Protein backbone atom coordinates (compact mmCIF):
# COMPACT_ATOMS: atom_id res chain seq x y z
CA UNK A 1 0.00 0.00 0.00
CA UNK A 2 2.94 2.34 0.59
CA UNK A 3 3.94 1.92 -3.06
CA UNK A 4 0.38 2.82 -4.13
CA UNK A 5 0.51 5.90 -1.90
CA UNK A 6 3.87 6.91 -3.37
CA UNK A 7 2.63 6.44 -6.94
CA UNK A 8 -0.61 8.36 -6.57
CA UNK A 9 0.94 11.13 -4.45
CA UNK A 10 3.18 12.06 -7.40
CA UNK A 11 0.08 12.66 -9.50
CA UNK A 12 -2.26 14.39 -7.06
CA UNK A 13 0.44 16.21 -5.06
CA UNK A 14 -0.86 14.87 -1.76
CA UNK A 15 0.54 12.04 0.37
CA UNK A 16 -1.78 10.10 2.66
CA UNK A 17 -0.83 9.40 6.26
CA UNK A 18 -3.64 6.85 6.56
CA UNK A 19 -2.99 4.15 3.96
CA UNK A 20 -6.26 2.35 4.79
CA UNK A 21 -8.44 5.32 3.81
CA UNK A 22 -6.64 5.56 0.45
CA UNK A 23 -7.16 1.85 -0.18
CA UNK A 24 -10.85 2.18 0.67
CA UNK A 25 -11.21 5.11 -1.73
CA UNK A 26 -9.80 3.04 -4.58
CA UNK A 27 -11.65 -0.24 -3.86
CA UNK A 28 -14.47 -1.03 -6.30
CA UNK A 29 -17.55 -2.82 -4.85
CA UNK A 30 -16.82 -5.83 -7.09
CA UNK A 31 -13.88 -6.79 -4.84
CA UNK A 32 -16.33 -7.76 -2.06
CA UNK A 33 -13.76 -6.96 0.60
CA UNK A 34 -14.98 -7.12 4.22
CA UNK A 35 -13.74 -5.61 7.45
CA UNK A 36 -13.56 -7.17 10.93
CA UNK A 37 -17.31 -6.51 11.39
CA UNK A 38 -18.07 -8.38 8.13
CA UNK A 39 -19.08 -5.12 6.45
CA UNK A 40 -18.24 -4.65 2.77
CA UNK A 41 -15.42 -2.15 2.29
CA UNK A 42 -15.54 -0.14 -0.94
CA UNK A 43 -15.39 3.46 -2.10
CA UNK A 44 -19.15 4.02 -1.81
CA UNK A 45 -19.21 5.71 1.63
CA UNK A 46 -16.28 7.97 0.74
CA UNK A 47 -17.95 8.73 -2.60
CA UNK A 48 -20.98 10.03 -0.69
CA UNK A 49 -18.75 12.33 1.36
CA UNK A 50 -16.59 13.40 -1.57
CA UNK A 51 -19.63 14.43 -3.60
CA UNK A 52 -20.64 16.91 -0.89
CA UNK A 53 -17.09 18.22 -0.44
CA UNK A 54 -16.68 18.74 -4.20
CA UNK A 55 -19.97 20.63 -4.42
CA UNK A 56 -19.00 22.86 -1.50
CA UNK A 57 -15.53 23.74 -2.81
CA UNK A 58 -16.74 24.31 -6.39
CA UNK A 59 -19.58 26.51 -5.12
CA UNK A 60 -17.16 28.60 -3.05
CA UNK A 61 -14.77 28.86 -6.00
CA UNK A 62 -17.53 30.10 -8.33
CA UNK A 63 -18.72 32.56 -5.68
CA UNK A 64 -15.25 34.14 -5.65
CA UNK A 65 -14.60 33.99 -9.41
CA UNK A 66 -17.91 35.53 -10.52
CA UNK A 67 -18.87 38.18 -7.92
CA UNK A 68 -21.39 39.88 -10.22
CA UNK A 69 -23.40 36.81 -11.19
CA UNK A 70 -26.76 35.87 -9.73
CA UNK A 71 -27.54 32.55 -8.06
CA UNK A 72 -29.15 31.07 -11.18
CA UNK A 73 -26.09 31.64 -13.35
CA UNK A 74 -23.76 30.28 -10.67
CA UNK A 75 -25.98 27.20 -10.33
CA UNK A 76 -25.72 26.49 -14.06
CA UNK A 77 -21.94 26.72 -13.89
CA UNK A 78 -21.80 24.43 -10.87
CA UNK A 79 -24.11 21.85 -12.44
CA UNK A 80 -21.77 21.56 -15.41
CA UNK A 81 -18.61 21.45 -13.26
CA UNK A 82 -19.80 18.70 -10.92
CA UNK A 83 -21.62 16.53 -13.48
CA UNK A 84 -20.49 12.95 -14.00
CA UNK A 85 -18.75 13.59 -17.31
CA UNK A 86 -16.65 16.45 -15.91
CA UNK A 87 -15.61 14.40 -12.87
CA UNK A 88 -14.77 11.40 -15.07
CA UNK A 89 -12.68 13.59 -17.37
CA UNK A 90 -10.64 14.86 -14.41
CA UNK A 91 -10.20 11.25 -13.31
CA UNK A 92 -8.89 10.43 -16.80
CA UNK A 93 -6.51 13.39 -16.61
CA UNK A 94 -4.88 12.00 -13.47
CA UNK A 95 -5.08 8.41 -14.81
CA UNK A 96 -7.09 7.32 -11.78
CA UNK A 97 -8.47 4.26 -13.56
CA UNK A 98 -5.11 2.51 -13.38
CA UNK A 99 -5.24 2.67 -9.55
CA UNK A 100 -8.78 1.34 -9.00
CA UNK A 101 -8.81 -2.02 -7.22
CA UNK A 102 -11.43 -4.31 -8.84
CA UNK A 103 -12.07 -7.98 -9.53
CA UNK A 104 -11.05 -9.71 -12.76
CA UNK A 105 -14.55 -9.68 -14.24
CA UNK A 106 -14.95 -5.92 -13.80
CA UNK A 107 -11.47 -5.28 -15.15
CA UNK A 108 -12.02 -7.51 -18.22
CA UNK A 109 -15.29 -5.69 -18.93
CA UNK A 110 -13.51 -2.34 -19.20
CA UNK A 111 -13.96 -1.30 -15.58
CA UNK A 112 -10.88 0.91 -15.54
CA UNK A 113 -12.32 3.02 -18.37
CA UNK A 114 -15.94 2.97 -17.21
CA UNK A 115 -17.05 6.58 -16.74
CA UNK A 116 -19.20 5.81 -13.70
CA UNK A 117 -16.31 3.97 -12.01
CA UNK A 118 -14.02 6.92 -12.70
CA UNK A 119 -16.56 9.40 -11.36
CA UNK A 120 -17.23 7.39 -8.22
CA UNK A 121 -13.58 6.70 -7.43
CA UNK A 122 -12.57 10.35 -7.84
CA UNK A 123 -15.36 11.50 -5.54
CA UNK A 124 -14.19 8.86 -3.05
CA UNK A 125 -10.60 10.07 -3.37
CA UNK A 126 -11.79 13.61 -2.62
CA UNK A 127 -13.60 12.31 0.45
CA UNK A 128 -10.48 10.44 1.55
CA UNK A 129 -8.26 13.52 1.18
CA UNK A 130 -10.76 15.50 3.26
CA UNK A 131 -10.70 12.91 6.07
CA UNK A 132 -6.93 12.40 5.95
CA UNK A 133 -5.76 15.94 5.34
CA UNK A 134 -8.62 18.29 6.14
CA UNK A 135 -10.34 21.05 4.19
CA UNK A 136 -7.18 22.95 3.24
CA UNK A 137 -5.62 19.99 1.41
CA UNK A 138 -8.79 18.91 -0.35
CA UNK A 139 -9.45 22.50 -1.47
CA UNK A 140 -5.95 22.62 -2.94
CA UNK A 141 -6.57 19.41 -4.89
CA UNK A 142 -10.01 20.42 -6.20
CA UNK A 143 -8.98 23.96 -7.16
CA UNK A 144 -5.94 22.59 -9.01
CA UNK A 145 -8.24 20.86 -11.52
CA UNK A 146 -11.60 22.64 -11.36
CA UNK A 147 -10.60 26.31 -11.23
CA UNK A 148 -9.22 26.22 -14.78
CA UNK A 149 -12.46 24.61 -15.96
CA UNK A 150 -14.49 27.32 -14.25
CA UNK A 151 -12.37 30.10 -15.74
CA UNK A 152 -12.79 28.52 -19.18
CA UNK A 153 -16.55 29.11 -19.08
CA UNK A 154 -17.16 32.44 -20.78
CA UNK A 155 -20.89 32.24 -20.08
CA UNK A 156 -23.05 30.03 -17.85
CA UNK A 157 -23.78 26.83 -19.81
CA UNK A 158 -27.33 25.89 -20.71
CA UNK A 159 -28.03 22.23 -20.14
CA UNK A 160 -30.25 20.34 -22.66
CA UNK A 161 -33.07 19.71 -20.14
CA UNK A 162 -33.38 23.41 -19.37
CA UNK A 163 -33.22 24.32 -23.07
CA UNK A 164 -35.93 21.79 -23.92
CA UNK A 165 -38.19 23.01 -21.12
CA UNK A 166 -37.77 26.64 -22.20
CA UNK A 167 -38.54 25.65 -25.81
CA UNK A 168 -41.82 23.96 -24.82
CA UNK A 169 -42.85 26.96 -22.72
CA UNK A 170 -42.04 29.34 -25.56
CA UNK A 171 -44.13 27.25 -27.97
CA UNK A 172 -47.00 26.84 -25.47
CA UNK A 173 -46.63 23.06 -25.27
CA UNK A 174 -46.88 20.80 -22.20
CA UNK A 175 -43.60 20.36 -20.34
CA UNK A 176 -41.35 17.42 -21.32
CA UNK A 177 -42.25 14.10 -19.71
CA UNK A 178 -39.33 11.87 -18.67
CA UNK A 179 -39.79 8.17 -17.99
CA UNK A 180 -37.46 5.40 -16.83
CA UNK A 181 -37.81 2.75 -19.55
CA UNK A 182 -35.50 0.17 -18.00
CA UNK A 183 -32.51 -0.38 -15.76
CA UNK A 184 -29.91 -3.01 -16.62
CA UNK A 185 -26.52 -4.14 -15.32
CA UNK A 186 -25.30 -4.94 -11.81
CA UNK A 187 -26.09 -2.71 -8.84
CA UNK A 188 -22.57 -1.26 -8.73
CA UNK A 189 -22.53 -0.48 -12.46
CA UNK A 190 -26.10 0.12 -13.68
CA UNK A 191 -27.29 1.51 -17.00
CA UNK A 192 -30.49 3.52 -17.24
CA UNK A 193 -32.66 4.03 -20.32
CA UNK A 194 -34.74 7.21 -20.11
CA UNK A 195 -37.32 8.44 -22.61
CA UNK A 196 -38.63 11.96 -23.07
CA UNK A 197 -41.91 12.79 -24.76
CA UNK A 198 -43.01 16.09 -26.30
CA UNK A 199 -46.51 16.63 -27.66
CA UNK A 200 -46.53 16.57 -31.50
CA UNK A 201 -42.90 15.40 -31.59
CA UNK A 202 -43.15 11.90 -30.16
CA UNK A 203 -40.64 10.17 -27.95
CA UNK A 204 -36.86 9.55 -27.94
CA UNK A 205 -34.70 7.51 -25.57
CA UNK A 206 -31.10 7.56 -24.33
CA UNK A 207 -28.92 5.36 -22.11
CA UNK A 208 -26.33 6.35 -19.51
CA UNK A 209 -24.76 5.22 -16.25
CA UNK A 210 -27.01 7.56 -14.22
CA UNK A 211 -30.60 8.74 -14.58
CA UNK A 212 -29.50 12.37 -14.60
CA UNK A 213 -27.10 11.91 -17.50
CA UNK A 214 -29.61 9.77 -19.42
CA UNK A 215 -32.23 12.52 -19.07
CA UNK A 216 -29.77 15.11 -20.38
CA UNK A 217 -28.88 12.88 -23.34
CA UNK A 218 -32.55 12.24 -24.11
CA UNK A 219 -33.28 15.97 -23.98
CA UNK A 220 -30.37 16.62 -26.34
CA UNK A 221 -31.70 14.02 -28.80
CA UNK A 222 -35.17 15.57 -28.62
CA UNK A 223 -33.77 19.03 -29.36
CA UNK A 224 -32.02 17.57 -32.41
CA UNK A 225 -35.28 15.91 -33.51
CA UNK A 226 -37.22 19.14 -33.07
CA UNK A 227 -34.61 20.98 -35.14
CA UNK A 228 -34.79 18.45 -37.97
CA UNK A 229 -38.60 18.30 -37.95
CA UNK A 230 -38.86 22.09 -37.91
CA UNK A 231 -36.63 22.36 -40.96
CA UNK A 232 -38.71 19.91 -43.04
From Swiss-Prot:
Annotated signal peptide: none
Matches recorded under CDD domains: DSRM_RNAse_III_family, RIBOc
Gene3D superfamilies with a match to the protein in the record: 3.30.160.20, Ribonuclease III domain
InterPro entries the UniProt entry points to: dsRBD_dom, RNase_III, RNase_III_dom, RNase_III_sf
Gene Ontology cellular component terms for the protein in this record: cytoplasm
Similarity comment: family membership: Belongs to the ribonuclease III family.
Protein name: Ribonuclease 3
Organism annotation: Wolbachia sp. subsp. Drosophila simulans (strain wRi)
Gene: rnc
Amino acid sequence: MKSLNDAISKIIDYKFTNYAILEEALTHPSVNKRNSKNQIVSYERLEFLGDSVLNMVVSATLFKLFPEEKEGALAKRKTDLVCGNTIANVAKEIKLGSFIIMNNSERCNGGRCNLKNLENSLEALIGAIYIDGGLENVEKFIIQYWEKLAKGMLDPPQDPKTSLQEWTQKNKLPLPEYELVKQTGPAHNPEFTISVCIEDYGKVSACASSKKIAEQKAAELMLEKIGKDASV
